């Protein structure tokens, strides 16, 4: 039961002293990649940080960003004559069945460039151009992504209990070399795996022991 002094405090309009935690500015925690955490400026906005690090805050213009989803094509020297090499590249860049019509200033048709189907040699011989990293942070992120992809590609998944028992039965009968005979054994190889598949199961079994 409250005494008279406590009742007077409750009825009084004078505010009581409390800790001013509400006015303290909370420190923002930066989650995500370690490289970005180390280079983050806490005094700048998210868009400013991403622009400084060479990253995109928003993927395209449609979602509210400043980057255009379909940038305006370059119109420099579009009236000049194309070289034979440029003409071949333009034909290969167009899908089959599509064409580009070139006109003069009066609207008369000068040339119709039809798209050509790419051969397998064209795809294999085409050089892949790698754009240089804009900033040191982007270079570190790209290097980290390459290393992570290499680790995942070299990592073998362990066999399930069914796969382990499946390949073990075949190894007990045929050994660890004759995978073609394993593939022909329709009784033990009920899933009809080929020799390459059975060999891969054996390699994974050895690697994950």
UniProtKB/Swiss-Prot annotation:
Its main location: nucleus. Residues 1-24 are annotated as: Disordered. GO terms for biological process: assembly of large subunit precursor of preribosome; ribosomal large subunit biogenesis; rRNA processing. The keyword Plastid does not apply. Pfam families: Nop16. It is found in: Nucleus, Nucleolus. The keyword Nucleus applies. Belongs to the NOP16 family. Involved in the biogenesis of the 60S ribosomal subunit. Component of the pre-66S ribosomal particle. PANTHER family: HSPC111 PROTEIN-RELATED, NUCLEOLAR PROTEIN 16. This is Nucleolar protein 16. It comes from Schizosaccharomyces pombe (strain 972 / ATCC 24843) (Fission yeast).
């Amino acid at each position: 039961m409250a005494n008279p002094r406590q009742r007077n405090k409750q009825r009084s309009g004078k505010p009581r002293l409390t800790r001013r935690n509400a006015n303290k500015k909370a420190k923002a925690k930066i989650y995500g990649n370690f490289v970005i955490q180390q280079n983050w400026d806490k005094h700048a906005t998210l868009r400013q940080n991403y622009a400084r690090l060479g990253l995109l805050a928003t993927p395209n213009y449609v979602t509210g960003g400043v980057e255009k989803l379909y940038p305006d094509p370059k119109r420099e020297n579009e009236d000049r004559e194309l070289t034979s090499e440029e003409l071949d590249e333009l034909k290969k860049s167009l899908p089959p069945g599509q064409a580009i019509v070139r006109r003069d200033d009066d609207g008369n048709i000068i040339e119709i460039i039809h798209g050509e189907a790419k051969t397998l040699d064209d795809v294999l011989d085409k050089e892949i151009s790698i754009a240089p990293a804009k900033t040191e942070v982007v270079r570190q992120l790209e290097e980290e992504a390459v290393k992570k992809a290499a680790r995942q590609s070299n990592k073998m998944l362990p066999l399930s209990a069914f796969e382990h028992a499946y390949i073990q039965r075949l190894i007990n009968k045929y050994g660890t070399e004759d995978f073609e005979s394993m593939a022909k054994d329709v009784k033990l190889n009920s899933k009809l795996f080929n020799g390459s598949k059975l060999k891969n199961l054996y390699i994974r079994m050895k690697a994950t022991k």
